Structures are given as structure tokens and as C-alpha cells.
Amino acid sequence: MARAIWSGAISFGLVNIPVKLFSAVQKKTVRFHQLDAKTGSRIQQKRVNPQTGEEVPYEQLVKGFEVSPDTYVVVEPDELAAIEPKKTHTIDIEDFVQIDEIDPIYYDHPYYLAPGTGAGKAYSLLLAALRDTERVGIARVVIRSKEQLVAIRPRDDVLTMETLLFGDEVVSPSDLGELPDPDEV
């Protein structure tokens, strides 16, 4: 049986529907490791300063953001904590749009939403309303310390939640170079 990876509530207006979140996909990939050909032992990665050639202990590592080639701004842990979104355990629906208003290129990762304890009727009502009106709920949720834009939509007898890419994360076709003119085919 699948295990919930998050629990919270779908919220819009005065409505609050407890739900559990499950990943809708299980990627089947083979993971290879680097091994020593002579002994078959797994190789370890070491943190080495390229300027000194010395190994850097974990306690000396800091996070930095590259502002230009080889120029970094160090970001302190308290600065990272200050910008971390507040965990609310709520999927806040901000709008409802027609299903065909979302270009599929913006869909990122699918999840299933199952009703929480005592939420069966409210869950079923939302599922039926979205299905009957062919609408999708556009919402925000914090998962693993990251705020996500998501779409809540019906799929058969279950609500799905798909993380959405922001516009600046999608590569424009104009960045691909010269494409053939479709009128000249």
C-alpha cells in the first residue's frame, strides 16, 4: 500500500478539506555507482578545494551564490531560514480555471490527493464540481520547504495535484534557433 508523503488540507473560501498526498509516479531507473575495477569497492567522493588541493571538512562548508564567474556571495544559515516559506500544511486554492487554459508544458510532477479522516463527502463534492465544470483549482502549497504552484484536477475518481512550472522555467521555442516555417511544408 502506498504511503502518504504529506498531509494537510485543501482550502478555499471557508472550505477546508483534509487530504493526504501520494506520489502518482514511481520512476524505474537503474542507478549505477562508481567502483574500483580491481577490488569492486565503491568509490567515495571527497570535498577538495581546487586552489589548495586540500580536503575540506564538512564543518567548514558554507553555501554561496555565484554572481559572476568565480565570484560568490556567501549566504548564512540564518539568511536562508529567513527566506524559507512558512509551512502551513494547506493547499490554498487561489483561482479556478478551465482545464484547457493550462498548457501541458507547465505540468511538472503528478500526485494523488486522498481524503483525510472524515473528509469523504467534502472531497467527493469538490471532485464532482471540478469534473462537472471542467475546471482546475490553481493553488499554492509548501512542500519540503519550497513553495509550489499547483493544479488540483479530477482524474477518474481521485483528485490529482500537479506541480506547475513557473513561466520563467519554461524554455521559449525562440531559444531553439531556426525552426522550419510551418507554412512552407
Please place each PLM-identified region on the residue numbering.
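Boundary segments of small protein-protein interaction reader/adaptor domains
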Residues: M1-V185
